[in-house]
């Protein structure tokens, strides 16, 4: 049998001796296992000896038990069986191994599935036995095929981090091979017939594990180099030949890993091996340059794809079994790329990671998808991406690492800084964003967007407004913004828009309907109303005449639209403004009786038709109400042109009607009036102008059969351009007085319905007539809260409209006082007078301690806090006491508290503790407790009580004697001159109504009413109400008022004590805020 094997054609002749084989064994041990000794490692040598002792019968049995043989043969070949009994020495002479991986293909080897040997031995036997069988059969057939076909037909799965590791390993191996004499032969082991046989090869020999790694590296390198054409590969591989057919290298890896996993999971079961091919481990070339080139190509592909995100290998199904194909000269068509092997099988083929190294996945997605998210150690928030985690940690650290180079602005995020830098860009270009409806200007477009929300009730097509749906929780009001309503009537042109706005069954449905409504569309809601109060309607249903019960205030929610007037006029003034607008919108006198709708009647129906600028509200009954067809709700084209003339005034009227809900709120859980009251028409033939049917909860519901009467020809419509021009809300005085004249001309009011009017001092009597809605403050409710627009529950029920004129006799003061300069409206004449002083250039309120001058008294009061004094007006009172302390009841305290920092003194412990909290920490201990009977001073309250109990028991408080300590002559002179001046001018100060009295802001100080009390109380400051007991303390206090140098801001004329404070203060004027210019409002 050995003779017959020798007669076989030798494919790879050997030219080395047995001694070189032993050296090759040593080289294998040194290169792969890292042994530095000259003897082979014990593991490799023992394994070789064990494989040599394998019996011939066992090997024959292993080869014959496989159901398939190499190259698709179903029965074992006789030549294959004879190969098992071949002697080891003959095999060493007939085989050789080269340093490069052959790209040739052989079928999957036969192996015993039931073998219980270690996984490494089975894997080597699986690889090498199959390659030898294919070599023998293919050589017998005599068919040779160029390996370029393999390279051209290979198709691989996408590269993973495993493939990248293999490519790096292949590159390292190639570099070592070149260093160890690339073209000189050396010894290594090869696997044959179940034994490891040393043979001649290069110095860099391959073990089965290294062969697997190189196989994977070569396969992935070919995959990554997709840009190479077939001709280039032909030139590269044309000098090599292979007798095997071409298949996919990835299919090889899939089959190999599946085989290994089956052997490792179920070693006792037999599994028919798939017939798919895998790359042969038989070396076919003697050049290490090709391996180096493949590794270099793989490294170049990795660098090219470094920036792209590499997907992780998916879990594929096991490779499908297909019939083996015989080797033929023409290359078969390239098969579809098979799925890559499972990750668990692929892990078996990987080289173990050396100690000290950690293999990290190359793509960021693999780390995020591997179930290892980032968790915040402070709040426990789990974040998927590391960049998001870093940005989240700024919340806890508070680190603002981004600094604006032009101003002190700092932020934590780069995008916020980028948005901030746009402000400086607009400032450098001189760009500002101007509101088209008011004088508002801003350097940021976003600030203009926020500002435009104020004008959403006066929406214009040319103004870019960020439209928002109003609060849908206001019950009884439409779920459509008035900006959308006006936007439709302006953008529509000749088109006519109409919608049916009905209240929903539940508050939940109401909120959903309001949230889903587009700003320019009308949403139809259910027609039943089972729980919500209906809107403001005009009904002809028969009801009790004296039905005046108000709605429960808990059913209403505060309207956010009142913020429009929050900076300009109060809500009460907005309500007064509303009443004049509503009166002007009346097309003809009507006999109305306003009542509060308590519960709608059955059979009450919707209004019939609407112009294009209006919407219908359907106050349905709480039980059931028949629906209304859409034909009855279509607009009338003939009435649309009438409303185009005064639609702006109606919009303002409806807005202010909504704002009037705020004017009746009671803060202390008292029933309030938040919505307009119901209107009941006594005469059913009275028709209402279409202009009343606008926008909010003031829409009037009428019967279907009621005809829509045209506007009288002799009636002058309201001003059309009243709100069409770009004016601010603060210029409402023009509208107010024009409408007041129209109201007074059109309606004749009796003295019972007219309340005495307080006219504005800035308008003549003939131009400004008395308004029927005005009232005197003396006729208001007795409670003082009514003066501020608050009405108690018993009085709110008395608010009704007088029948006969259709105008209400409201029980609160609604006279408005506008400013001629800026148009701002005030509710009191005193407030207007104080406001007018801001428009004058004269600064008549001057500080007597420094050069500061203010336009109004409030600003001077605020400024005087720097000097620890307060300015008090004596316009209406002869004597004003600025401070009324609890200790001013005449009680005599045995001791008092004195502050060493500012000289403040008080006898009450609570006031003194409150005062000392104003100082910094190091100054809070600079105080003393002084005895009123003597000069005893201490810092402990227990000591002063002991002192009083032992020394001054039963004694009355005495006037403290003057101290003998030296004093400053300048302070004494100032005190004497000030005291003498105050004695001479004391009576004049009390007589003059417009003079100023300077008193102390300290709550514990005793007020000084006249100059005669000073000798009894000791030393009293002429600049403030400070009184002290000793002269040295009085002189120390005077130093506060003798500040010779104050640092004044040249922009706002504010004084600072130190130049550092002034420098810090000036930064407020240099940093742009993007807000409203103070001079315009």
From Swiss-Prot:
Chief subcellular location equals nucleus
Q: List, as start-end ranges, the regions of compositional bias called Pro residues.
A: 327-344
Q: Per the record, GO CC terms?
A: chromatin; chromosome, telomeric region; nucleus; ribonucleoprotein complex
Q: Tell me the protein family, please.
A: Belongs to the krueppel C2H2-type zinc-finger protein family.
Biased region (Basic and acidic residues) positions are: 1-10, 631-640, 947-960, 979-988
- What Gene3D superfamilies does the record tag this protein with? Classic Zinc Finger (3.30.160.60)
Find the cross-link Glycyl lysine isopeptide (Lys-Gly) (interchain with G-Cter in SUMO2). 176, 216, 226, 360, 372, 466, 475, 523, 549, 580, 587, 597, 634, 639, 658, 673, 704, 710, 742, 778, 798, 870, 891, 958, 1014
Q: Which GO terms describe its biological process?
A: chromatin remodeling; establishment of protein localization to telomere; negative regulation of DNA-templated transcription; negative regulation of shelterin complex assembly; positive regulation of transcription by RNA polymerase II; telomere maintenance
What gene, per UniProt, encodes this protein?
ZNF827
Cross-link Glycyl lysine isopeptide (Lys-Gly) (interchain with G-Cter in SUMO1) maps to which residues of the chain? 673
Query: What protein name applies here?
Result: Zinc finger protein 827
Q: List the disulfide bonds.
A: none
SUPFAM superfamilies per UniProt: beta-beta-alpha zinc fingers (SSF57667), Formin homology 2 domain (FH2 domain) (SSF101447)
Biased composition of type Low complexity is found at 961-978
Lineage in the entry? Eukaryota, Metazoa, Chordata, Craniata, Vertebrata
Subunit and interaction comment: Part of a transcription inhibitory ribonucleoprotein complex composed at least of the circular RNA circZNF827, HNRNPK and HNRNPL. Interacts with the nucleosome remodeling and histone deacetylase/NuRD complex. Interacts with RBBP4; the interaction is direct and recruits RBBP4, a component of the NuRD complex, to telomeres.
Which segments does the entry list as coiled coil? none
Q: Which domain of life is it from?
A: Eukaryota
Q: Where is this region: Mediates direct interaction with RBBP4?
A: 1-14
Q: Which UniProt keywords apply?
A: Chromosome, DNA-binding, Isopeptide bond, Metal-binding, Nucleus, Repeat, Telomere, Transcription, Transcription regulation, Ubl conjugation, Zinc, Zinc-finger
- Tell me which species this is from: Macaca fascicularis
């Amino acid at each position: 049998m050995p003779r017959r094997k020798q007669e076989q054609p030798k494919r790879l002749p050997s030219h080395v001796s047995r001694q070189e084989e032993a050296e090759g064994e040593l080289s294998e041990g040194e290169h792969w296992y890292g042994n530095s000794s000259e003897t082979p490692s014990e593991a490799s040598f023992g394994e070789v000896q064990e494989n040599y002792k394998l019996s011939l019968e066992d090997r024959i049995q292993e080869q014959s038990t496989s159901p398939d043989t190499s190259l698709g043969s179903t029965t074992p070949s006789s030549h294959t069986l004879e190969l098992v009994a071949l002697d080891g020495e003959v095999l060493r002479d007939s085989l050789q191994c080269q340093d490069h991986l052959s790209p040739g293909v052989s079928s999957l080897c036969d192996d015993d599935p039931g073998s219980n040997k270690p996984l490494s031995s089975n894997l080597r036997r699986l690889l090498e036995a199959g390659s030898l069988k294919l070599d023998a059969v293919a050589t017998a057939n005599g068919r040779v095929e160029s390996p370029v076909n393999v390279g051209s037909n290979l198709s691989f799965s996408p590269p993973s981090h495993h493939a990248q590791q293999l490519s790096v390993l292949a590159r390292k191996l190639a570099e070592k091979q070149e260093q160890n004499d690339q073209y000189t032969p050396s010894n290594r082991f090869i696997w044959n017939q179940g034994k490891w046989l040393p043979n001649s090869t290069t110095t860099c020999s391959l073990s089965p594990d290294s062969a697997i790694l190189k196989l994977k590296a070569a396969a992935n390198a070919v995959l990554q180099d997709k840009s190479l054409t077939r001709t280039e590969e032909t030139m590269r591989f044309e000098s090599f030949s292979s007798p095997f057919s071409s298949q996919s290298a990835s299919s090889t890896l899939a089959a190999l890993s599946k085989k290994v996993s089956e052997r490792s999971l179920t070693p006792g079961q037999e599994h028919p091996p798939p017939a798919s091919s895998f790359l042969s481990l038989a070396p076919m070339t003697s050049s290490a340059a090709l391996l180096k080139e493949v590794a270099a190509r793989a490294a170049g592909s990795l660098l090219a794809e470094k920036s792209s995100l590499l997907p992780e290998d998916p879990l594929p199904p096991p490779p499908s079994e297909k019939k083996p194909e015989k080797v033929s000269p023409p290359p078969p068509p390239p098969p579809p790329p098979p799925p890559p092997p499972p990750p668990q099988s692929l892990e078996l083929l990987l080289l173990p990671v050396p100690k000290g190294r950690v293999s990290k996945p190359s793509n960021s997605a693999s780390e995020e998808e591997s179930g290892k998210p980032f968790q915040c150690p402070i709040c426990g928030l789990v974040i998927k991406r590391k960049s998001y985690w870093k940005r989240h940690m700024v919340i806890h650290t508070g680190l603002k690492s981004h600094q604006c180079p032009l101003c002190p602005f700092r932020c934590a995020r780069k995008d916020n800084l980028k948005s901030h830098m746009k402000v400086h860009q607009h400032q450098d270009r001189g760009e500002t964003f101007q509101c088209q409806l008011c004088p508002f200007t801003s350097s940021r477009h976003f600030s203009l967007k926020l500002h435009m929300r104020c004008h959403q009730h006066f929406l214009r097509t040319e103004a870019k407004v960020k439209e928002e749906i109003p609060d849908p929780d206001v019950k009884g009001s439409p779920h459509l913004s008035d900006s959308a309503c006006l936007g439709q009537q302006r953008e529509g042109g000749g088109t006519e828009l109409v919608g049916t706005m009905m209240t929903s069954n539940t508050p939940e449905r109401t909120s959903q309907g309001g949230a889903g409504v587009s700003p320019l569309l009308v949403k139809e809601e259910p027609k039943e109303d089972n729980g919500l109060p209906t809107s403001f309607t005009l009904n002809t249903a028969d009801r009790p005449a004296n039905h005046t019960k108000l709605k429960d205030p808990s059913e209403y929610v505060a309207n956010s639209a009142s913020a429009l007037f929050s900076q300009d006029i109060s809500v009460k003034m907005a309500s007064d403004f509303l009443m004049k607008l509503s009166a002007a919108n009346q097309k003809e006198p009507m006999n109305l009786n306003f009542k509060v709708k308590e519960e709608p009647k059955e059979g009450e129906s919707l209004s019939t038709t609407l112009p294009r600028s209006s919407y219908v509200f359907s106050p349905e009954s709480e039980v059931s109400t028949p629906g209304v067809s859409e034909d009855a709700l279509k607009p009338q084209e003939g009435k649309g042109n009438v409303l185009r003339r005064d639609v702006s005034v109606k919009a303002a009227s409806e807005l202010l009607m909504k704002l009037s809900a705020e004017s009746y709120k009671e803060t202390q859980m008292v029933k309030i009036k938040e919505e307009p009251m119901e209107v009941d028409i006594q005469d059913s033939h009275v028709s209402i102008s279409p202009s009343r049917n606008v926008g909010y909860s003031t829409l009037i519901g009428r019967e279907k059969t009621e005809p829509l009467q045209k506007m009288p020809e002799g009636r002058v419509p309201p001003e059309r351009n009243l709100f069409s021009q770009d004016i601010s809300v603060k210029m409402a005085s023009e509208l107010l007085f024009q409408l007041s004249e129209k109201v007074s001309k059109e309606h004749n009011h009796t003295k019972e319905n007219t309340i005495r009017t307080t006219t504005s001092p800035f308008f003549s009597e003939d131009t400004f007539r008395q308004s029927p809605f005005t009232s005197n403050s003396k006729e208001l409710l007795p409670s003082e809260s009514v003066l501020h627009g608050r009405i108690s529950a018993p009085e709110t029920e008395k608010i009704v409209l007088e029948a006969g004129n259709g105008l209400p006799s409201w029980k609160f003061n609604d006279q408005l006082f506008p400013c001629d300069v800026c148009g701002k409206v005030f509710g009191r004449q005193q407030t207007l007078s104080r406001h007018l002083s801001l428009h004058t250039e004269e600064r008549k309120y001057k500080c007597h301690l420094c050069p500061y001058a203010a336009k109004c008294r409030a600003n001077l009061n605020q400024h005087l806090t720097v000097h620890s004094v307060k300015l008090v007006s004596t316009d209406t009172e002869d004597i004003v006491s600025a401070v009324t302390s609890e200790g001013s009841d005449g009680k005599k305290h045995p001791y008092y508290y004195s502050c060493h920092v500012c000289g403040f003194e008080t006898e009450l412990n609570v006031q003194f503790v409150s005062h000392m909290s104003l100082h910094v920490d190091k100054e809070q201990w600079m105080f003393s407790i002084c005895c009123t009977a003597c000069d005893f001073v201490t810092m402990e309250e227990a000591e002063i009580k002991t002192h009083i109990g032992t020394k001054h028991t039963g004694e009355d408080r005495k006037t403290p004697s003057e101290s003998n300590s030296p004093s400053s002559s300048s302070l004494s002179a100032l005190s004497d001159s000030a005291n003498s001046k105050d004695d001479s001018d004391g009576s004049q100060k009390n007589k003059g109504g417009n003079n100023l009295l300077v008193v102390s802001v300290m709550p514990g100080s005793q007020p000084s009413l006249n100059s005669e009390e000073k000798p009894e109380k000791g030393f009293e400051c002429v600049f403030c109400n400070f009184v002290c007991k000793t002269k040295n303390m009085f002189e120390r206090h005077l130093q506060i008022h003798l500040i010779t140098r104050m640092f004044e801001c040249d922009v706002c004329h504010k004084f600072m004590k130190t130049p550092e404070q002034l420098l810090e203060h000036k930064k407020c004027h240099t940093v742009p805020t993007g807000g409203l210019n103070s001079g315009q409002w």
